[in-house]
Design a protein with these regions (language model features):
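Secondary-structure end/capping motifs
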Residues: 232, 237-308
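Short helices/loops that flank or line small-molecule/ion binding pockets
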Residues: 41-60, 73, 122-123, 127-128, ...
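Immediate post-signal peptide segment of exported/extracytoplasmic ligand-binding proteins
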Residues: 2-12, 101-111, 308, 313-315
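Pocket-lining segment of extracytoplasmic ligand-binding domains
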Residues: 157-264
Length: 328
């Protein structure tokens, strides 16, 4: 694509420094027609909130569930099918070994910790537990210790806030919770996303000891490959410069292609690289597929799951949620 411009347009861009996007933020791969101003937010979760509440950036990496909810409530930005983080979700829900939790239905009538009800990890996992294992999510008390990014959400009555001054990690330790999501999604951290995380160890067993095997089988059955990070662009930017969608898509695709070479050669050895190399055994050579065609089933599944969990007030057409940069 060749963009004929007298001068490049300036865009404020907030993306995490990931192995497959770093070539963009380092300036090694340009975004055609764009003079980027990269704004580093640590953790990137803080940028989600700033984008949703203040629409602070022209381009931002954001959690897809947060985005879909915000869009349903009229957020003036739209997503591109550039999914920069992905993982499966049979693993990552940790249980106290003394709580008698042997299967998902055992969570009914009990308290489970998740940072916020709309956290993408929680949404995907609840969807799996409901659809595949018959969990009645309304019979679980979901305990949160953070705000929802999207303030308009009307939370179900079975979502409660942790007591003042108590973190999910504390509650898990003393038996106030029988289960909680690992890492930043729940019991592996404390503190506000606007002020930085304090990491906490969470040495508890997974609900599913054979999670990897279950994830492989679920993917082969459904074709759904959960995404965790997507790129959004202000509506106003695309209204004035529609070509920006393709410029961004091509830049991110080139950066990923460069990274894939190192991934398959074995040269890439970060924890993230190792995770995605393992995922290639399930999803194929490209563990981060971009584009609408390749991701349509997964996008539809997330929109459906968010609505069923009462996170969005209405159903939305995929064309209202995503711009296909390959059709611009």
């Amino acid at each position: 694509m060749v963009v004929a411009l007298a001068e490049k347009i300036k865009l404020d861009i907030a993306i995490a420094d990931l192995p497959h996007t770093a070539a963009i933020s380092r300036g090694e791969i340009p975004i055609e027609g764009v003079e980027p101003n990269f704004i580093k937010v640590v953790p990137q979760i803080g940028a989600f909130r700033r984008m949703v509440r203040q629409v602070e950036f022209d381009v931002c990496e954001i959690a897809p569930t947060t985005y879909i909810i915000a869009r349903a409530y009229g957020a003036p930005f739209v997503a591109l099918p550039i999914f920069v983080t992905r993982r499966f979700h049979h693993g990552g829900l940790l249980v106290r070994p003394d709580a008698g939790i042997k299967q998902p239905k055992d969570l009914e009538g009990r308290k489970v910790g998740v940072r916020a009800y709309s956290v993408t990890t929680g949404v995907w996992t609840r969807g799996i537990l409901i659809d595949e294992y018959g969990l009645d999510s309304s019979k679980v008390t979901w305990v949160v210790d953070d705000e929802e990014h999207v303030t308009q959400i009307q939370l179900p009555q079975n979502v409660v806030h942790a007591p003042e001054g108590r973190s999910l990690a504390d509650m898990m330790e003393d038996g106030g919770l029988v289960a909680g999501f690992e890492a930043n999604a729940g019991i592996g951290r404390s503190g506000s996303p606007t002020g930085g995380w304090k990491e906490r160890e969470a040495n508890y067993p997974d609900l599913f000891p054979n999670a990897a095997e279950l994830e492989d089988a679920w993917y082969r059955k459904t074709g759904i490959y959960p995404m965790h990070g997507t790129i959004v662009v202000k509506d106003a930017v695309l209204a004035k410069h529609p070509w920006v969608a393709r410029s961004l898509f091509e830049a991110f695709s080139r950066a990923k292609a460069k990274w894939l070479d190192t991934l398959h050669s074995g040269a890439a050895q970060t924890a993230s690289d190792k995770k995605y190399r393992a995922l290639t055994k399930i999803v194929g050579d490209d563990p981060l597929p971009y584009g609408m065609k390749q991701n349509l089933a997964t996008v539809k599944a997330l929109e459906d799951t968010a609505f069923k969990q009462k996170l969005t007030p209405k159903r939305m057409a995929i064309s209202d949620i995503f711009v296909d940069p390959e059709q611009v």
